[in-house]
C-alpha cells in the first residue's frame, strides 16, 4: 500500500506517518511515484470501490492521499488520468479526530476499509489493529463492511449502501 503524502497535516496526529514508521505502508511525496493503473482512494469521485478493483489493487497497488480535508480537492487531479479513482461507500470514522463522522476516514481507516471490501479481511484486521482505535473502527462498521465485501460490483455496493444511509443523506 502506498500513501502519497501532501505534508499539510499535523505530523503528530498523522496516521499515514505512523503507519509508515511501523513499516505498514510505503510513503512518497511525488505523484509520479504512484503506479499507473493503481486504485486510488478518492473521496471526491462518484464510483464506489468494489471487488471489481481487486486485481488492479493487487497488481498495481492501493493508494491513499494523506492531505488535510480542507485541501482534498487539490491533490487527486494529477493522478486521475492514469489511475482508478474510487470512493469508499458509507462508513463511520472511529479515529479520535473525526470520531462518529460519516465518510471522513483517516488514511489508515480508508486503507483498512478498502482491504476489507476487496476481500482481504484478515489483512485489514491485522493492519488496523496496530492502532488503538482500530478495533473500534471495525466493530462500528462490521455490518456495513461485511455487506460491501459480499457485493460483486460497484453498482451493487452503491445499492447495498442505500440500506445504511441515514434518512436525508
Ligand atoms: C483527507 S486524508 C486525511 C488524513 C488524516 N489527516 C490522517 O492523519 O489520517 C484521508 C485520505 O484517506 C482516504 N479517504 C478517507 N475517506 C475516504 C472516503 N470516504 N472515500 C475514499 N477515500 C477516503 C483518501 O485517500 C483521503 O485523502
Curated annotation (Swiss-Prot):
- State the reactions this protein catalyses: an N(1)-methylpseudouridine in rRNA + S-adenosyl-L-methionine = N(1)-methyl-N(3)-[(3S)-3-amino-3-carboxypropyl]pseudouridine in rRNA + S-methyl-5'-thioadenosine + H(+)
Would you say which domain of life the source belongs to?
A: Archaea
Checking InterPro entries in the record gives: Tsr3-like, Tsr3_C
GO CC: one term? Answer: cytoplasm
Q: Name one Pfam family in it.
A: Ribo_biogen_C
The record's keywords, sorted A to Z, are: Cytoplasm, Ribosome biogenesis, rRNA processing, S-adenosyl-L-methionine, Transferase
Q: Give GO terms: molecular function aspect only.
A: 18S rRNA aminocarboxypropyltransferase activity; S-adenosyl-L-methionine binding
Q: Where does S-adenosyl-L-methionine bind?
A: 15, 65, 88, 107
Instruction: Report the coiled-coil segments.
Output: none
Q: Which GO terms describe its biological process?
A: enzyme-directed rRNA pseudouridine synthesis
Query: What EC identifiers does the entry list?
Result: 2.5.1.157
Cellular compartment(s): Cytoplasm
PANTHER family, alphabetized = 18S RRNA AMINOCARBOXYPROPYLTRANSFERASE, RIBOSOME BIOGENESIS PROTEIN TSR3 HOMOLOG
Question: What family does this belong to?
Answer: Belongs to the TDD superfamily. TSR3 family.
| Primary role | Aminocarboxypropyltransferase that catalyzes the aminocarboxypropyl transfer on pseudouridine corresponding to position 914 in M.jannaschii 16S rRNA. It constitutes the last step in biosynthesis of the hypermodified N1-methyl-N3-(3-amino-3-carboxypropyl) pseudouridine (m1acp3-Psi).
Put simply, this protein is called 16S rRNA aminocarboxypropyltransferase
Organism the protein comes from? Methanopyrus kandleri (strain AV19 / DSM 6324 / JCM 9639 / NBRC 100938)
- Organism classification, top ranks? Archaea, Methanobacteriati, Methanobacteriota, Methanomada group, Methanopyri
Amino acid at each position: 500500500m502506498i500513501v502519497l503524502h501532501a505534508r499539510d497535516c499535523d505530523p503528530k496526529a498523522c496516521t499515514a506517518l505512523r503507519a509508515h514508521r511501523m513499516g505498514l505502508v510505503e510513503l512518497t511525496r511525488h505523484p509520479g511515484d504512484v503506479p499507473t493503473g493503481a486504485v486510488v482512494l478518492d473521496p471526491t469521485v462518484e464510483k464506489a470501490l468494489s471487488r471489481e478493483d481487486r486485481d488492479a489493487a493487487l497488481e498495481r497497488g492501493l493508494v491513499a492521499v494523506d492531505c488535510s480535508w480542507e485541501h482534498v480537492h487539490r491533490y487527486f487531479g494529477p493522478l486521475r488520468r492514469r489511475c482508478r479513482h474510487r470512493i469508499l461507500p458509507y462508513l463511520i470514522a472511529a479515529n479520535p479526530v473525526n470520531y462518529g463522522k460519516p465518510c471522513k476516514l483517516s488514511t489508515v481507516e480508508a486503507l483498512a476499509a478498502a482491504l476489507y471490501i476487496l476481500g482481504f479481511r484478515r489483512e485489514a484486521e491485522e493492519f488496523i489493529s496496530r492502532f488503538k482505535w482500530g478495533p473500534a473502527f471495525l466493530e462500528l462498521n462490521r455490518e456495513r463492511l461485511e455487506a460491501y465485501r459480499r457485493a460483486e460490483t460497484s453498482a451493487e455496493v452503491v445499492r447495498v449502501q442505500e440500506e445504511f444511509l441515514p434518512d436525508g443523506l
